[in-house]
């Protein structure tokens, strides 16, 4: 609960239309994609960087918790206010594209710009912003930076960190810093921008981002490989990726995911397949596209692919990617609640990871449909609970074993969803005591009063 003096300060600062403590607003900002609920004490919508600075300075002086928030589309509770405090939302006012520099192929944006809107705007200029998280129609670029979001095109084009050139950040004490430059090369000083990426709002509030753009490839084409065994599909991934061909995307659905999508949408997927790989290539000339697809088909078939279909028109392209993008919602047929995480391993370890998941599924009796970005080793595992009240504890134990399997294969707890609340307790699986202390010391140096998004990331 905020004291009256604090309420009055925030109202005076941003006005009554941009600061709220009523239950309707608190309820609207108490949850994210996890559906877990934590009621904040207030919600504030700063109109500019200076207001962010004044808000943080005041909150730091009065020890008021601040939880930065974009669209609330995260899967780990990173934007939830677990101990009251103030949700600072950038979605209402800080949503402008400030500059698109076609000469230097960069753009400056405010943190509340929606990813897909930004993609659409730069494409009007024949430019290209590759990071395309599944939440691209909802998630903000500030949130993408805070989580280091990836997407399907990461196999060729990388993830958010590969496109962040610079940013402006408001620190916990209200000071404003610049991190990075518009230049391609910059080795002057520490890489503070890199430190802020994936920090989940624990180190500062991002107020502006400078992003790298690419020229848009004029041609693209997709294909699907069908495999009887999921291990064959996983082997095909790393052997194809190491052959000299670099597809834009290399995605997979396992048998459970295929069946779920077909049951819901009837897109013509092979329901008896052990797995499918959906891939896309791009380029400048048709011969380049044809060569890449031929090479992929060759490597797929050398590793157990029983059918290889190339999309022949735009509708077939859309159907392939519709199936992949809607796998997450389709698997709800298997349970009332899902525990979904996104472990990542080196590509060559994908067969071993999926074998371990199958063993854990059998051990605990849960259906665990899997799909994801195999081109970068990122697998979305979904433990389906038919009776959440009875099975939740057992489900968490199963997920912990999946985390342990990923770590044992030199992988990580999360490739793109982040740590937030849901994976915070598992951080010691991936980091030793000295490493966790380093994280805490960095947090303490930048936020000594621990007002910025506390309790996240195990900090």
Summary of predicted features, one role per range:
Residues 1-32, 61-64, 299-317, 408-409, ...:
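N-terminal accessory segments
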Residues 1-57, 73-105, 134, 255-266, ...:
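N-terminal flexible segment immediately upstream of the FAD-binding catalytic core
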Residues 38-45, 87, 106, 336-344, ...:
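Glycine-rich tight-turn/loop motif centered on a GG-T
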Residues 59, 381, 447:
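Conserved, mostly hydrophobic/aromatic
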Residues 96-251, 452:
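FAD-binding subdomain of flavoenzyme oxidoreductases
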């Amino acid at each position: 609960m905020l004291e009256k003096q604090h309420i009055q300060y925030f109202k005076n600062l941003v006005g009554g239309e941009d600061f709220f403590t009523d239950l309707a607003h608190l309820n609207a900002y108490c949850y994210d994609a996890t559906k877990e609920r934590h009621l904040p004490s207030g919600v504030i919508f700063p109109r500019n960087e200076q207001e962010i600075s004044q808000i943080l300075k005041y909150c730091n002086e009065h020890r008021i918790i601040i939880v930065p928030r974009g669209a609330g589309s995260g899967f780990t509770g990173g934007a939830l206010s677990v101990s009251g405090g103030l949700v600072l939302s950038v979605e209402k006012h800080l949503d402008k594209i400030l500059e698109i520099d076609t000469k230097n192929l960069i753009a400056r944006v405010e943190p509340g710009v929606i990813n897909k809107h930004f993609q659409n705007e730069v494409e009007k200029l024949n430019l290209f912003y590759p990071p395309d998280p599944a939440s691209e129609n909802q998630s903000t670029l500030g949130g993408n930076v805070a989580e280091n979001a990836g997407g399907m095109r990461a196999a060729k084009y990388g993830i958010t960190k590969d496109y962040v050139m610079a940013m402006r950040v408001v620190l916990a004490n209200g000071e404003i810093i610049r991190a990075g430059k518009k230049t391609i090369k910059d080795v002057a000083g520490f890489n503070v921008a890199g430190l802020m990426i994936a920090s989940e709002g624990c180190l500062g509030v991002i107020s502006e981002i400078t992003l790298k753009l690419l020229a848009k490839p004029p041609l693209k084409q997709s294909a699907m490989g069908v495999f009887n065994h999921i291990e064959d599909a996983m082997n095909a991934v790393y052997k194809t990726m190491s052959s000299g061909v670099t597809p834009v995307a290399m995605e997979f659905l396992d048998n459970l995911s295929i069946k779920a999508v077909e049951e819901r949408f009837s897109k013509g997927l092979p329901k008896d397949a052990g797995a499918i790989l959906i891939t896309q290539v791009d380029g400048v000339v048709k011969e380049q596209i044809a060569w890449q697809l031929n090479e992929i088909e060759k490597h797929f078939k050398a590793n157990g692919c029983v059918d290889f279909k190339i999309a022949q028109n735009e509708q077939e392209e859309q159907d392939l990617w519709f199936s992949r993008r809607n796998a997450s919602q389709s698997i709800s047929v298997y349970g009332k609640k899902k525990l979904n995480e996104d472990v990542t391993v080196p590509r060559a370890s994908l067969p071993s990871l999926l074998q371990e998941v199958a063993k854990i599924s059998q051990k605990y009796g849960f259906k665990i449909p899997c799909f994801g970005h195999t081109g970068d080793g990122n697998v979305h595992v979904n433990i389906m609970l038919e009776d959440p009240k009875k099975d939740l504890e057992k489900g968490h134990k199963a997920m912990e074993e999946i985390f342990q399997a990923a770590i044992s294969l030199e992988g990580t707890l999360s490739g793109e969803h982040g740590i937030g609340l849901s994976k915070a307790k598992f951080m010691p699986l991936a980091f030793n005591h000295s490493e966790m202390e380093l994280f805490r010391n960095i947090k303490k140096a930048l936020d000594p009063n621990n007002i910025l998004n506390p309790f996240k990331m195990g900090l």
